[in-house]
Amino acid sequence: MADTIPSSHASDAAAEDPYLWLEDVEGDAALSWVRGQNERSLAELQADPNYAAYEKAAVEALTSAERIPYGTIREGMVYNFWQDDTHVRGLWRRTSLESYANDAPEWEIVLDFDQLAETEGKNWVYKGADCFRPKGSDAGYKCMVSLSNGGKDAVIRREFDLSTKQFVEDGFVTPEAKQGGAWASPDTLLIATDWGEGTLTASGYPFIVKRWERGAPLESAEELIRGEAKDVGVWPMALELEDGRILQGAAQADTFFTTRYWWFPEGETDPVRWPIPPKSSPEGVYQGQLLVSLQEDWAPA
């Protein structure tokens, strides 16, 4: 039995589908429908007599001064993103490991997002930072900080110096888009973004990854891999080896649940696919071996 629909029948099916307009995920009609469904759902939830108490408890838990300040360790410092009633947009801050072990750590502010939003007149929402320093280098960390104007998926990314606690003058900056990036070297970024008409998937995410050198215009970036418009998206990735080299690659999400992983061999023009299951995630490298977390059984060849 054929597993495809004859074109005439496919056209008839499309014509009879009353919800085909929802495929235009950014269209006014689809977004208006979503807003209506959200309002309907919220009204239903708020009608529950327990709603107010649950909401109050959730807000108190999320904004409690007693909650654990989870952090990331860099150069012997613990970095933490913190929000409270005073700092609604949040603080990026750091403290020493010794101070962090105390009941009341002494935090140093790295970046105040409320202050940044007020200074720049933007509704900035912090969406994370991708930081890098070459192994064995005395240089400080540089980070690509992702900022969303209003909390949407699209962000701008700006280079930030953790040593000076300032955005880098004439540093890397990407325009607003649904995008992803990874450091390939102190002066090289792997970028997936909106490269123009026809470069986004139906989900609105990029499917082309390029290599961008410092000082060069973004438009001159070298294409490394091109996925397909039917993918969920394609994003760059980089894994640091024990000798300091960077393993450059990309993650091509065929579906929401499955991903193909590629690496870009130095001196080669074509990417090479890693022979790992589509329901898995590379987590790092240890003693020359790739560490992979699995979401399905795997019997390596």
Which role does the model predict for each range below?
Residues 1-301:
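Beta-propeller folds
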